[in-house]
């Protein structure tokens, strides 16, 4: 909800009715506040300013970020592929500033946790304990993660403080300033999580599967554009490579198995990711 203060400042009111978890609501507000305080003072890049929290009522107030979220901007006002790539570079630069603003740690990548996680999911699907749409294709994705992980173990990666929900709806663009909103976590994790949540969100909405190379989730020009702005790691970072496939599976698991149980948005998401999966989950070589 939009309002205006006595001083003329535009305000954004947020009220969360469900789930009722005041401690979690406060925690998310605190993470956003910490991100705002740490973010560098830069021309053209910002984090929305938190102003007020009522923990028990689950109400918060932020300074309003002018503009459109990138999902809407690219859908309605930036339809050409060339202009979208410029926006992707800008988004990459915002995330680069965000990740560098606080703790960064270099690590040797061990994909064992990710592989074990998805192997457990595969076991639940095969034993009937978990239902997903198009399970055969989903399981090819698990096999692809196993294949990729074997080639990525031992490579260097970077962990940093995550955004937590870095999709296209959480960057606001007014033509001059790109502003991050809805920051929800404060823990260290590999950079590939934030990077792929954003890029897979873009690819599924705006790129046909024909643009992909076999075995890949992200088209080459998308990688080049984003990583022209995001320079903390290269597109060859092991978590960027592995978690692109994992992000497809994470989206997939949120979609009900039965079509009649899906919202229109969930059905659309499935229609978007299946063609990508058919190309991306093909074995390399």
Regions found by a protein language model. Give the residues of each.
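Active-site activation/catalytic loop segments of kinase-like enzymes and analogous catalytic loops
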Residues: 193-234, 245-264
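Short beta-strand micro-motifs within the conserved protein kinase catalytic domain, predominantly
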Residues: 47-58
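Catalytic activation segment of kinase domains across protein kinase-like and atypical kinase folds
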Residues: 169-197
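An alpha-helical support segment within catalytic cores of ATP-dependent transferases
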Residues: 101-164
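ATP-binding glycine-rich loop module of kinase domains
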Residues: 2-27
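The N-lobe alphaC helix and its flanking beta3-alphaC-beta4 segment of protein kinase-like domains
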Residues: 23-38
């Amino acid at each position: 909800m939009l309002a205006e203060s006595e001083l003329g400042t535009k305000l954004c009111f947020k009220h969360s009715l469900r789930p009722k978890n005041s401690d979690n609501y406060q925690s998310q507000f605190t993470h956003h506040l910490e991100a705002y305080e740490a973010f560098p003072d830069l021309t053209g890049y910002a984090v929305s300013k938190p102003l007020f929290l009522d923990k028990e009522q689950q109400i918060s107030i932020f300074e309003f970020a002018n503009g459109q979220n990138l999902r809407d901007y690219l859908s309605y006002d930036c339809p050409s592929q060339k202009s979208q790539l410029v926006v992707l570079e800008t988004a990459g630069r915002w995330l680069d500033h965000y990740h560098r603003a606080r703790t960064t740690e270099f690590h040797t990548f061990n994909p064992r946790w990710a592989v074990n996680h998805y192997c457990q999911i595969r076991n639940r699907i095969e034993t009937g304990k978990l239902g997903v749409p198009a399970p055969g294709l989903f399981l090819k994705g698990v096999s692809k993660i196993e294949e990729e992980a074997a080639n990525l173990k031992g490579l260097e990666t970077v962990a940093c403080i995550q955004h937590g929900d870095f999709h296209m709806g959480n960057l606001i663009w007014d033509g001059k300033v790109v502003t991050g909103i809805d920051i929800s976590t404060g823990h260290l994790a590999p950079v590939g999580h934030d990077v792929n949540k954003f890029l897979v969100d873009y690819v599924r909405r705006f790129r046909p599967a024909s643009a992909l190379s076999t075995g890949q989730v992200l088209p080459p020009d998308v990688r080049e554009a984003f990583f022209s702005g995001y320079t903390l790691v290269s597109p060859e970072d092991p978590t960027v490579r592995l978690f692109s496939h994992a992000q497809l599976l994470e989206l997939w698991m949120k979609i009900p198995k039965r079509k009649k149980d899906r919202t229109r948005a969930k059905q659309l998401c499935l229609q978007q990711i299946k063609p990508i999966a058919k190309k991306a989950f093909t074995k390399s070589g």
